[in-house]
Regions:
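Short, small/polar residue-rich loop motifs at catalytic or cofactor-binding pockets
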Residues: 73-74, 289, 442-443, 466, ...
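Short, acidic, Ser/Thr-enriched surface-loop or helix-capping motifs
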Residues: 81, 139, 451-452, 573-574
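N-terminal "domain-start" segment that seeds a small globular fold
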Residues: 423-460, 485
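Extended, low-polarity transmembrane helix blocks
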Residues: 2-140, 144-432
Length: 613
């Protein structure tokens, strides 16, 4: 059928404009949040100068933030902000499930696909809210990490990075592809956002852990084990990484990079990736040998835990990561709908932090006396003596910025949480499907046909009710059942208004025009008991006349045993028999979210004619 699987039009101007408008509105609210918090902070500090002075005298920390933690906090803070900005791409709202999430899951086991597709469907129910939520949550986490250098707020920022990172890793990266064939460090295994989560867990550690020499050793040991494991996986025979070509076809790595080079991106980058692909096809064994050896050496150095070994190896490892990032991962975000820079940048940050943790491990003797003698103050004690105005006055600018970042996260998450409570998809998804929606106002073409029960039905007999009209092939097993269910769901969504709306389908199959075929279709699709459902047929001459009046091309007769090839259409007719809306109806990928979105659009159109907003 011509319309089937043409899919979602991610560049649809209506959808793009709606997403941009949502981001602009929420962006203004985000700025207002920071402005109000800043104004409140300045005002209270002026009102309570003593509290502000006390804060100024106590700004020297008992224990300075170690360099390894600064690298993680600042580095991943910048990455989260950058990722949030990437999520603001106009095509991202409706394109992420179909062009990013589902393709990644396609090669994974069925249970992974079910988990990921469930998330994609839920995203698609409310794509504007989901797209905006992902922008502000990630920007908020990034600002939070950058602003909160120490204390409970800083540790909570680390936990937020862990939580959101795991959500993205599971549902957005399909568990980083660890269950899919072809798993390789070269293409980002075990998932970039899992590294974000690991970094967040390290940031969330209490300050007493900073002073432990074991922290650096455990971190470098973990990195070492991972790299050695990836080296073994890369060297494993039969996975296709050793030969540059096999039986005249590109090897595993060359095949991957060749595909990456075809994605939309700057010409110079595509040329570099193509050049590497050609080189790998000619020297695949040597390329894989270098990669395996480099991973093994780097892993062994990190496992040793010795800064003198890790330092020089880290420099070489960083060079390898940059080369991989450019020539194999394609910079991660320049091809297609990129959502992050991929794994090499966060990998270098984590490895650098691990090196700094063992190179500059603080000795217990160097701990300041104030830190040694300080009595920990618990949450109960803090709440007991808390004085809100003075607490605000004594707060630093970093704390205020952290509070603003938390507000930004809530700003993104709250609308999505509210939207998810609705079982009905946003009508914007229907508008993103290839097709058109035109507002019109002219007398609808007349028809006089027979319904599924053999009764005569004409457009005149339906006057006084809103008519939602479509054309269905009673033997179709692809689009038509989906459209029928959309009409059925629209009837359910109308509730008590359904009594004033007729759901009408006209037969679009020139070969099967008997009433018995219509009845069989109704039973199959659960429409037999729907009181306002009318499925109409007639003689071939009558049907051809109706098709012509509604400017619908005649269905294409295909070989016996196949479905009738046809387009998908829907019309909205008001109570006076005037055509008010024409829908180019394409069911796209046929997901539950798509169906619900079309049902919601039909429901809205009917309610507008009934006088409801």
């Amino acid at each position: 059928m011509p319309g089937m699987n043409s899919g979602i039009n991610v560049s649809n101007p209506i959808v793009v404009a709606a997403f941009k408008a949502a981001l602009v509105h929420q962006g203004l609210i985000a700025l207002l949040i920071f402005a109000l918090l800043g104004l409140a902070w300045v005002t209270v500090r002026i009102s309570f100068p003593a509290a502000a002075a006390t804060r100024a005298q106590a700004t020297a920390p008992a224990l300075a933030e170690p360099a390894w933690r600064q690298v993680l906090r600042i580095g991943f803070g910048v990455l989260w902000v950058f990722d949030g900005i990437l999520q603001a791409q106009p095509k991202m709202a409706v394109g992420l499930p179909s062009q990013v999430i589902e393709p990644i899951a396609a090669s994974s086991p069925r249970w992974v696909q079910q988990v990921v597709n469930w998330a994609g469907t839920n995203w698609s129910y409310h794509p504007m809210q989901a797209g905006a939520a992902s922008v502000w949550i990630q920007v908020g986490i990034g600002i939070w990490l950058l602003a909160a250098a120490r204390g409970p707020l800083s540790r909570l920022a680390g936990l937020a990075s862990v939580g959101w990172g795991l959500v993205v890793w599971v549902f957005g990266e399909s568990f980083g592809g660890i269950f899919a064939p072809g798993l390789t460090w070269l293409f980002g295994a075990p998932g970039a956002v899992l590294i974000y989560a690991v970094a967040g867990a390290l940031i969330a550690l209490p300050e007493r852990a900073w002073r432990s020499p074991w922290l650096g050793r455990l971190t470098t040991a973990g990195i070492g084990l991972f790299l050695v494991g990836m080296a073994v996986l890369q060297a494993w025979p039969g996975r296709g990484f050793w030969p540059g070509t096999a039986l005249g076809q590109p090897g595993t790595l060359a095949g991957m990079t060749g595909t990456m080079a075809q994605t939309p991106q700057p010409g110079f980058l595509s040329a570099w990736v193509n050049a590497f692909t050609t080189f790998d096809e000619a020297h695949g064994f040597a390329v894989n040998l270098v990669v395996v050896a480099a991973l093994a050496v780097a892993g062994a150095a990190f496992l040793s835990g010795r800064p003198r070994l890790i330092g020089p190896v880290l420099a070489g490892f960083a060079v390898l990561c940059v080369a991989d990032w450019v020539l194999i991962e394609d910079l991660g975000f320049l091809g297609g709908l990129g959502t992050d820079p991929n794994s090499m940048v966060p990998m270098v940050l984590l490895a650098t932090a691990g090196y700094l943790a063992v190179a500059r491990a603080p000795a217990a003797a160097a701990e300041p006396a104030a830190a040694q003698s300080a009595t920990p103050v618990g949450w109960r004690e803090r709440l007991r003596v808390a004085d809100a105005p003075r607490a605000v006055a004594s707060a630093g600018i970093r704390s205020v910025a952290s509070a603003g970042a938390i507000g930004v996260i809530i700003l993104g998450a709250a609308p999505m949480a509210v939207a998810q409570a609705s079982p009905v998809a946003d009508t914007i998804l229907a508008q993103s499907i290839n097709g058109s929606s035109n507002q019109v106002n002219f007398p609808a073409p007349a028809f006089s046909l027979t319904d599924q029960d053999g009764r005569a039905v004409s457009l005149v007999s339906l006057r006084g009710n809103v008519v939602l009209l479509t054309f269905l092939d009673d033997t179709c097993s692809v689009d038509c059942p989906l459209i029928a269910q959309e009409f059925r769901q629209a009837g359910q969504l109308l509730g008590t208004d359904a009594a004033r709306v007729d759901l009408v389908a006209i037969n679009y199959n020139p070969l099967d025009i008997q009433v018995s075929y219509l009845q069989a279709f109704d039973r199959q699709e659960g429409l037999a008991g729907v009181p306002n459902w009318l499925y109409l047929t007639g003689t071939l001459a009558q049907l051809e006349q109706v098709w012509s009046r509604y400017s619908i091309p005649p269905p294409e007769i295909v070989p016996a045993g196949s479905m009738i090839a046809h387009g998908d259409y829907a019309f909205v007719i008001d109570q006076a028999g005037h055509m008010r809306q024409e829908l180019g109806f394409d069911t796209g990928p046929g997901t539950q979210a798509t169906k619900s979105s079309f049902a919601a659009e039909l429901t809205d159109a009917a309610r507008q004619l009934l006088g409801h907003s």
